[in-house]
Amino acid sequence: MGARASVLSGGKLDKWEKIRLRPGGKKKYRLKHIVWASRELERYALNPGLLETSEGCKQIIGQLQPAIQTGTEELRSLYNTVATLYCVHKGIDVKDTKEALEKMEEEQNKSKKKAQQAAADTGNNSQVSQNYPIVQNLQGQMVHQAISPRTLNAWVKVIEEKAFSPEVIPMFSALSEGATPQDLNTMLNTVGGHQAAMQMLKETINEEAAEWDRLHPVHAGPIAPGQMREPRGSDIAGTTSTLQEQIAWMTSNPPIPVGEIYKRWIIVGLNKIVRMYSPVSILDIRQGPKEPFRDYVDRFYKTLRAEQASQDVKNWMTETLLVQNANPDCKTILKALGPQATLEEMMTACQGVGGPSHKARVLAEAMSQATNSVTTAMMQRGNFKGPRKIIKCFNCGKEGHIAKNCRAPRKKGCWRCGKEGHQLKDCTERQANFLRENLAFPQGKAGELSPKQTRANSPTSRELRVWGRDNPLSKTGAERQGTVSFNFPQITLWQRPLVAIKIGGQLKEALLDTGADDTVLEEMNLPGKWKPKMIGGIGGFIKVRQYDQIPIEICGQKAIGTVLVGPTPVNIIGRNLLTQIGCTLNFPISPIETVPVKLKPGMDGPKVKQWPLTEEKIKALTEICTDMEKEGKISRIGPENPYNTPIFAIKKKDSTKWRKLVDFRELNKRTQDFWEVQLGIPHPAGLKKKKSVTVLDVGDAYFSVPLDEDFRKYTAFTISSINNETPGIRYQYNVLPQGWKGSPAIFQSSMTKILEPFRKQNPEMVIYQYMDDLYVGSDLEIGQHRTKIEKLREHLLRWGFTRPDKKHQKEPPFLWMGYELHPDKWTVQSIKLPEKESWTVNDIQNLVERLNWASQIYPGIKVRQLCKLLRGTKALTEVIPLTEEAELELAENREILKEPVHGVYYDPSKDLIAEIQKQGHGQWTYQIYQEPFKNLKTGKYARMRGAHTNDVKQLAEAVQRISTESIVIWGRTPKFRLPIQKETWETWWAEYWQATWIPEWEFVNTPPLVKLWYQLEKEPIIGAETFYVDGAANRETKLGKAGYVTDRGRQKVVPLTDTTNQKTELQAINLALQDSGLEVNIVTDSQYALGIIQAQPDKSESELVNQIIEQLIKKEKVYLAWVPAHKGIGGNEQVDKLVSQGIRKVLFLDGIDKAQEEHEKYHNNWRAMASDFNLPPVVAKEIVASCDKCQLKGEAMHGQVDCSPGIWQLDCTHLEGKVILVAVHVASGYIEAEVIPAETGQETAYFLLKLAGRWPVKVVHTDNGSNFTSAAVKAACWWAGIKQEFGIPYNPQSQGVVESMNKELKKIIGQVRDQAEHLKTAVQMAVFIHNFKRRRGIGGYSAGERIIDIIATDIQTKELQKQIIKIQNFRVYYRDSRDPIWKGPAKLLWKGEGAVVIQDKSDIKVVPRRKVKIIRDYGKQMAGDDCVASRQDED
C-alpha cells in the first residue's frame, strides 16, 4: 500500500481529507479512497502511477469520460475520485465532490477554448492523437504500421471477459489510439463472431455515415489538379477508400482525422450495445435482430430478478415487456400464440427464428394461405360454418364472457383446480394431467409408491394401459382410484403402439399417440357431412376433412368423436378418443434393493412422547400425512407398535405452506453407525471442460428409496388431536425419512448402484453425483447429448426417481452445489455482503462463512480481523462493535467481491501450478492454475498451529495444505511458486527438516518476500560475554524473579508480579538480550524457552516473545545453549540461587537425588517419578531430559542427525554371547536385525546386500569396527551403489540412533525372551514389535508405517524435480531498456508473470516479460536476430 499511499503527501493529504464526499455530508475523503482508485485503474488497464500528478489525472479523466453515460456506479465513483484528486494536485480549493466536478468542467471548457484558438492561429484544427501508427521513414514518406497482433489479442480478450459491459468503451478507446479506419475494421472483424452486436454496430455506422453525407455535400465540378477529394461517409468507414487515401487525409494540411471520426461512430454504436447487454432498467432489455430468443429470455429474467418491484409488477413486466421488446420476427409469433401462452411454448415457437429454415417456413405458410384464400372466402360468406368456440367464465362458470370481464365477486383459490394457495397461472394441474381429465393412476403419480402395491411386485416396463368396459368410468374418473380391475390390455412402449381399429365398417391399423390432440386417418369415405380444415404437424400443414360424431372401436372399446381424414403418413388415434376409452400412461417402477438396518446392540427403539401442537399445525400435519399415505411413503399402524418419535411443523420460507419435521435425535443415537460413501463434495475446479453439460436434480430423492421392512417400526410417529378429542393417528415410514442418520449413506449407495449400468453403457458421459444433484457432461454435440440425457432420465424414472423439469437445467449458467457453471468457466453463486449498522455474533459468523466460500475463486479475501471479534464465549445475539482493522478488512473484501471472478476447468494434459503470496498478519493467499491469469481455484491460509511461529514455517504448512487439497480434487500435487529465496529456505530446512514434507518448488519474486529475520549460531561465540539466565515464580502468590549472572562478574535480578515459571524464564532471556552487546552467549535451563527461540519465530501471540524477537533481530550473533537444572553447573547454580530466594518452596528438593538414582537404575518415565517421589512434573521431566540414555537423537526439533530417506546406521551388539547385527533407518527408526554366526566382513556384507534388496539404501553409517572396514563390505557397497561413512564421537552424524535402538531392541528382547527357545527367534519377535506395535513421534506412526511414507514422499519429490528441469529447454533473446538490438541467446532460469530471470554468460539478470522472446532450443535452425525478432509471442 506504500506506493499507492504516496500519491499525496504533507499539506495535500490534509486538503484531501477535508473534502466531503457529498455536499453537506459527514463523510470525507480518506487515504483508502486513493488505494481503491488505484486498484480500479488496474482493472481498466490504466496506470495507477498517473494519480501522482495533475497531468496524469487529466489523462485518466480523458479516458473515462466517454463511458460515463453508460457506465456503472463504480465507474462514476472512480471518475469523481480522480476529478477531486486533480483539484487537490492543482491547488484548487473545493469543499466537496460536486464542487470538484464543476471546477473540472470549467478547466475542460477553458482548455477546449485554448485548443480552438491555437488551431485557428496555426490553421491546424486537428484533434488527431500524436500516437497513431503512421510514422515518417528516412525518406520523409508517411508509412503505416499495421495494428499489432498483441493489440488485437488484447481487444479479443476484453470482449470475451467483459462481454460488452461499460468497461469495453474506454478499453476500445485506449487500444485504438490513432488507428486508421482500416485498423479499426480489423479490430471489429476479430470479434465478428458476436453477430447480434456487430449487426447493431453496422446499423449505427450506416446511420452516422448517412448523416455525414447530409452535412458534407459533394462540391459541384471537377477536382482541381493536386487537390484531394473530400471523404464520403463510406470512405470514413473504410469501405470505399484505400489505405493510402486514409493516410493522405490524416496527414494532409489541414488534416481530416478520418480515423478519429470513425472511432467516434463506433463508440456511439458500442454505447447502444452496452445499453442492451448491460441495461440499467428492464425497459432497456431488447432482443437483437439476430439474437436467439432463448438468450434474450435469459437476459430479460436476469435483469428482472434485480428489479426492485413487487411480484405483481414483475408478473406484468413478464406478460407485456417480454413480447413488446422482442424483435419483429419473434413478436409476430408471440402475438399469434396469445396472452395465455407459457414460457416453454414461447421458446419452442421461437426456436430458430431469423435463420434460413424459419424464413422458408414463413414463405411456405404464406403460399398455403394464398392457395386456400378461395376456401377462406367461402367460409367467410357463410357457405361453411366453422366450429365456434364456446366462451366460458372461469370465475362464475357462466357462458358468454371471460373471467377478466366477469362482474361477479372473485372466487377464492385457483380457477382450474379449485384449491387455495395459488392462482391459475401457477397451477400444476395442467402440466400433470395432460390427458385433459383427471384419469386415475393405479399406482399413484409417476415415481411414487402405491399404498396397495409395493415396488417389489410392480411391472418392470413402461406401459400404455387401456381400461376395460367392465370397469365403468365416472365423468372425472376419480372413483376409479384404488378399485381398478387389472383385466385390461397393456401395451408396452418398447415398440410403436399399433392397434387394430374398426371405423365405418372397415378394419384398419392405427397408432395410439398421446401427444396428438386429434384423430387423423388416411383417405377413406365416411358417411355424413364434413368441413374443410388445416392442421399443423412436424412435417408442415396438411388439408383434411373433419367428420363429427363418428363411431369407432379401439381394442374392443367403443367411442364416438371427431375424426379427420387426409393425406397422413400413418393413422393416428389422438387424445380426443383415447380419453373416452380410459387410456392412461403408466410409469412402473423397478424394485430398489433395500439395505438391512439394525439398532445398536443392546438398544431398543425410541419411546419419546409427542409434545402438544397448535390447531393449525395439527391440521397442516394431517393434510401432509394424508397425501404421503396416498403416495405410499408412510403407512398407518396400530397400538401394537410401542415406539414413537415427536413431530412438529414449520412454515416454509416466503410461503404460507407448512413443512413436516421429525425429531429423529433419539432414533439416531440408537441406530447403527454408517460409513459415509462420499466424504466430501465435488469441486468445479476438478471438472474437465466439456462441450455439453446438463444439471439434474432428482425429485423426492429420499422418498424414492424404500426403508428396510424390519426397521420401519422404529420410525413410528403420532399426530395428536386437539383436547385429546380422539386417539392420535399413528404412522410409520416406508421410505427413507428426512433427518434420519442412515438416509444419506443408503441413498448414495442406492443411487450409485442405479447409475452404474448407465455409466458402463455410456462411458463418454461424465456423471458427478452428490446426493440428489447430478452433473452430466460430455463432448458430444448438444443434440446427441440431450438424447443421452433423456435416456438417463428414463433410466432414473424406471427406478422410481422423478426428475422435475423446473430443476432440469439445460442451458448455462448451471446452478450446482452452490456454484455457477458456464461452458468454459465457473464461479460461486452471487455473494452479497449485508450492510448493517450493528453486527451480532451470528451476523459476523454468517459473514465469515460467506467470505470463506467466496475465497475459493476470489483471490485476496481476508477474515483474520473479523474472526478476532468472535474470540471468547459470546451469545449469538450479542452486538459486537467492529474494530477499525475489521472495518478496513470488510471494506477490502467488498471491493474484491464487486467484480465477478471466474475460474476455468481442469485440463489433465497440462501441469498444475500453485502460487502463494504473503498478505501480512499471518495470512496467505494462493492461486492454482494451468495457464497464467486463468485460475482453476484460489484460496487462503491463515492458520497458526502454535502461539509462536515464523513465515517459513507457516509457508511450509500452507504448501502442505494446498498439496492435500490438490490431491483430493485432481489426484496430483502442483508445482509450487513461492515468495522465498532458495538460500533462506535451505538455511531453515537444514535445521528443521522434520517440520513437514514439501514438494519441489521454484522462487517467484512477489513482494513481500519471506525471510528469516535472525539466525542462531551453532557453536559458542569466542570472546562474547556469556549470560546464565534463570527465572522462578510462586504458583500461589504469582510473584517471581528473573535474572542473569555473566562470566565477567555482572549480575541482575528483577522482581515480577502476576507471572509464571515459563514467563520468568523468557523474561530472563529478554534481560540478557537487552543488557548484552551485539554478540552474546546465553545459557538457560528451560526446555520451554529453548524450544520457542530455537524455532526462530518472527511473530507470536505473546507480547514478551515479540520483545525477544525484536532484540534478536538487533543482534549480530546469538548462541543459545541448554544445561540441566539443579546439577551444580557453575553459572546456572549461581543464578538459580539468586532468583529462588523468597520465591520457590524447597520442600520437594529432598526427593530429587533419590529420584535421579532411581532413574539411573531403571530409566522410569517422568510420570512414575512424579508419583513415587512427590515431584512437580516440570522437575521430573527435566530429570528425564538430562538423561542421555533416554533421549532418542533425531526425534526432536533440535536434533542434528542427517535423516535423508536413504541413510541407514549399522552396528553390532552382543547378547547371550552371540552377535546381533542391527540396521536402523535413521529417518523412521525402522529396524532390520539378525543374529550372525561371527562378527566378520563376509557375514556383514551378506547382511548388507539382503538389506539393499529390500529397501532403497543410499548411505550406510558405521563405526570403525574391523568387520565394517573390511574389503568384503567395501565391495558390497560398491556393487550396490551404496556410500559408506564412518562415525566419530559427537559428530552430528554419529552412531547415536543405532546405539539407542540397540538398547531399545535389547529391552524388548528381555520382555519376550521367555516366549522363544532360541535367541534368533526372540530377535525377530522384538523387531516385529518395534516396527509395527510401537507408535511414537510426529503423527503417531509406527516405524514400519513411517518408512513407507518417507519413501513414497521421496519418490513424489523426485518426480516433481524432473518436471521442473523442463524449463531449461528454452532460450531467451532480450533487449535492454535503451539498446534496441536483441541480445542472446541466454539461459532461462525462471519465468514469472511480469518478468523473467535469465543467465547471460556469467551474469544473472531480471528482464520484464515485454522485452524478451522465449523460444525452444531448436539448435542451429534459428539463423539470427532477424528471425527471432519476428516472433511476436512466447506463449
From Swiss-Prot:
Chain residues that bind Mg(2+) 3: D1211, D1263, E1299
Cofactor(s) recorded in Swiss-Prot or TrEMBL: Mg(2+)
Q: Where is this region: RT 'primer grip'?
A: 814-822
User: Where is the motif (Nuclear localization signal)?
Assistant: 26-32
Give the start-end ranges of region Disordered.
102-128
* Interaction with host AP3D1 as annotated region, ranges: 12-19
- A single GO CC term, please? host cell plasma membrane
Region listing for Interaction with host CALM1, in residue ranges: 8-43
Q: Where is this region: Dimerization of protease?
A: 489-493, 537-543, 576-588
What is the regulation of this protein's activity?
Protease: The viral protease is inhibited by many synthetic protease inhibitors (PIs), such as amprenavir, atazanavir, indinavir, loprinavir, nelfinavir, ritonavir and saquinavir. Use of protease inhibitors in tritherapy regimens permit more ambitious therapeutic strategies. Reverse transcriptase/ribonuclease H: RT can be inhibited either by nucleoside RT inhibitors (NRTIs) or by non nucleoside RT inhibitors (NNRTIs).
DNA-binding region ranges: 1370-1417
Q: Which residue ranges does the UniProt annotation give for the motif Tryptophan repeat motif?
A: 985-1001
UniProt name for this protein: Gag-Pol polyprotein
Q: Which organism is it from?
A: Human immunodeficiency virus type 1 group M subtype D (isolate ELI) (HIV-1)
Its encoding gene is what? gag-pol
